[in-house]
Amino acid sequence: MEIKDQGAQMEPLLPTRNDEEAVVDRGGTRSILKTHFEKEDLEGHRTLFIGVHVPLGGRKSHRRHRHRGHKHRKRDRERDSGLEDGRESPSFDTPSQRVQFILGTEDDDEEHIPHDLFTELDEICWREGEDAEWRETARWLKFEEDVEDGGERWSKPYVATLSLHSLFELRSCILNGTVLLDMHANTLEEIADMVLDQQVSSGQLNEDVRHRVHEALMKQHHHQNQKKLTNRIPIVRSFADIGKKQSEPNSMDKNAGQVVSPQSAPACVENKNDVSRENSTVDFSKGLGGQQKGHTSPCGMKQRHEKGPPHQQEREVDLHFMKKIPPGAEASNILVGELEFLDRTVVAFVRLSPAVLLQGLAEVPIPTRFLFILLGPLGKGQQYHEIGRSIATLMTDEVFHDVAYKAKDRNDLVSGIDEFLDQVTVLPPGEWDPSIRIEPPKNVPSQEKRKIPAVPNGTAAHGEAEPHGGHSGPELQRTGRIFGGLILDIKRKAPYFWSDFRDAFSLQCLASFLFLYCACMSPVITFGGLLGEATEGRISAIESLFGASMTGIAYSLFGGQPLTILGSTGPVLVFEKILFKFCKEYGLSYLSLRASIGLWTATLCIILVATDASSLVCYITRFTEEAFASLICIIFIYEALEKLFELSEAYPINMHNDLELLTQYSCNCVEPHNPSNGTLKEWRESNISASDIIWENLTVSECKSLHGEYVGRACGHDHPYVPDVLFWSVILFFSTVTLSATLKQFKTSRYFPTKVRSIVSDFAVFLTILCMVLIDYAIGIPSPKLQVPSVFKPTRDDRGWFVTPLGPNPWWTVIAAIIPALLCTILIFMDQQITAVIINRKEHKLKKGCGYHLDLLMVAVMLGVCSIMGLPWFVAATVLSITHVNSLKLESECSAPGEQPKFLGIREQRVTGLMIFILMGSSVFMTSILKFIPMPVLYGVFLYMGASSLKGIQFFDRIKLFWMPAKHQPDFIYLRHVPLRKVHLFTIIQMSCLGLLWIIKVSRAAIVFPMMVLALVFVRKLMDLLFTKRELSWLDDLMPESKKKKLEDAEKEEEQSMLAMEDEGTVQLPLEGHYRDDPSVINISDEMSKTALWRNLLITADNSKDKESSFPSKSSPS
């Protein structure tokens, strides 16, 4: 029988819908196992056609047609025509061209818009003395999962490996079997009737066995998650199962342990001719042992026998698996099996329109869109199983999945299979064991190239133009108006202001806030302490806390990028030391001159905002970003270790002790033998007489304050030896680093449910600090603790909270202050904007935009306020900001088993930064709690933050390549396009710049550090002489050029022309002139027909047809 004749006979069997409203999920009545689902249980799984994706890579959105009246007329014309679907595709040279044409078409309704698919493979099974049933043996959401041989558990998800023979057989099934597209049916019984009627009318099925096949299709379906009512709660449950129940969403908690009742299952509108499945009288043969080796029959799996009439049985929904199914997903059911009364295969591929919820058919209660039925004679169970796996795997393929939705006839489906065969990779049988399960990859390659037509040689593919500057968005365009960039920043950020507070209602934000509060407190207090030593207490810890709190609150509320965390920086401390030394030498008021410099710096920064100077950020490329960020991370690690080593001075260890003399160990305070002149002067001023002091009774701190000396075997040079404290501090330090890293990676571990792992990972650092504090308190060793000021007042009594810019200084100092203010302006600008550039990287997928001008304005204003109040200056802190961003990463909650969660972006909000600095300002009143936090724990947090911030920096990946043989090097994209020697040269230059920055940072010349960071931009420009433009495009961002605007305008015009063609419904394919004349293009369909394997399959199909022609039939094919 010809395929065209077969298609002509299908047309009368395709009823058309008369309603023109939105498609409603009507459910079905064929199932005896009715299921009642609570509304909140299935929320998100019953709503269809709300958010859909369009498979064509070049199109961004789907055009919705408002003129629905045309559908009736179009369908009437299609029904009157003799075509199978009323739509014909032109002929093409290759299957890829046909598939690209299919995916490029648009339909007038939403029935052909692809949805996510859940595919289930059921095989018919029977046991002696029991009724037959369909048993679930495998399922696909993204990767394949099989029911293990014992029948009690699912296998781990794995990449399906298919035999080429089964793919050829599947192609033959689609080519010769029954294909019914856009069938309108409401129950499984109606579907079976239409399929079998078509089979009988086309001569593929004998009328005598039609009824028995129908009864086989109506048999009960048993799914892996079904359990008996009496055994729903086993006596012994694993902790993982208990945790799983606790980790379900609140909307599902109350129903998670309940079995749904059958009273309110969705009823079908047409409930007619209901034939009960349990009364079926199909006599299956006992000879199903003809299964081939290598495939375990579903009947061989351990079964849970469910006794009693079906109306007493109730289904349990696997809510944990339901969470992994995307909203709007549809089902694809594969039914395969052996029947003793058949002597040839029965094959049908059905696409329902609309999708219908068929009760009991699928494991999860979602509408069914596709059915594939393959029933055949005994002895070929393994063959049918592999064909079922093949079609199921094809349905999970991104391209064939879209073809199945948009196919107009069987030829489209065959083209989809051929295109799939054109892309598959074949493994040699002698070098690979097919029984080995391949682990799912971490990153699945994109399939967009398969959907978009190829282009002739010499032309650039659309969307693959060479990249330009990495920071060339609209927020960095010069406006040419005073404060033009600032106005645009405000307009860009204002619509998101309230959402910045709403989006913070998440446990992740709470975890981020608690972690970063502890991380920000210590450097602020430490910086204040160092500043107090450098300025003789004029600016100390309490001023640092107050300034950080006030500046941070204002910035978090009104800044352009609230993800940035403000903090103190090393160059600012160096500047403060130099300024104080200068004022002391020349008898000037330090706070007054500092206020003048701060006001000039704020004014200059505001001028930079007014002139859109932040647009210069586009010259800061990855080369400069990574050198700066790497330096800050290394400094964090270095200072954490340095602070740990400094503890050995305060808590020395006796390295030469004698265990035999421990009983004689003592350390006493005695009067100094030769007191210095300074000591004698201090005693006279305090009216202290050395002879009146009982030196032996003094404590360590009292002895130190009176300049006494320590005598005894247990004494060091300046202090008594302190047992255990240093070693205990080292233990706390490294335990904090290790536990923080371990708990942060807990999200990817194998233990506990997903929700538990996610919470532990989010609160990793806070839980670590809490654990270390409790352990330290329980052990009782007097480790150094965090010291927080307990009184809110200036450190010195001779200063207040406000400072006049002039004060006792000469009037000309106010004008002269502009000179150091210029240097401070460069320092503030570079620190702020480089950190902002790192936070606003495209890979962070920020959706609310950035505000470089608004950020700089807020920093400038608060710098002026802090100057008048005599408080430290604060600017963007690189490592704290990167840590803040990393703690707020969003990943997809709905991911298929075996699929890695997708990075969705950052939870952009203002609340975490706001709460950090509010609590920081309140720390004065929390001294009784904060005094229990050991300083080594905070040093360990610093080391963890510095090390974790290094992840993702390409510079360190390239450093590793120096000691790595080429065959072991990772598959970095730049290694594919840039010679290795050029990669090494680029890295060496970057390392040299980093080394120079480090030398300047730790030396007395640290004041010029911002100038050296600025010099990196010029170094990067000179690298254009050593590298080609193409090489730099892979290793670094290209520098902005004068031609960039013209190139962007040309790209915009090209995009507009492409959109215009799409609106006209035109899809241009290079069908002539390229493919036909290119001898390298192979048509896999033609080549397949020449293979001996395909010819053998055709001979088998022809013999079956000849045999079928001898069957008596009530209706012959036309």
From Swiss-Prot:
It is a multi-pass membrane protein. It is found in: Basolateral cell membrane; Apical cell membrane; Cell projection, Dendrite; Cell projection, Axon. It comes from the Eukaryota. One of its GO terms (biological process) is bicarbonate transport. Disulfide bonds: none annotated. The keyword Ion transport applies. The keyword ATP-binding does not apply. One of its GO terms (cellular component) is somatodendritic compartment. InterPro entries: Band3_cytoplasmic_dom, HCO3_transpt-like_TM_dom, HCO3_transpt_euk, Na/HCO3_transpt, PTrfase/Anion_transptr. Residues 77-90 have a biased composition (Basic and acidic residues). This is Sodium-driven chloride bicarbonate exchanger. It comes from Homo sapiens (Human).
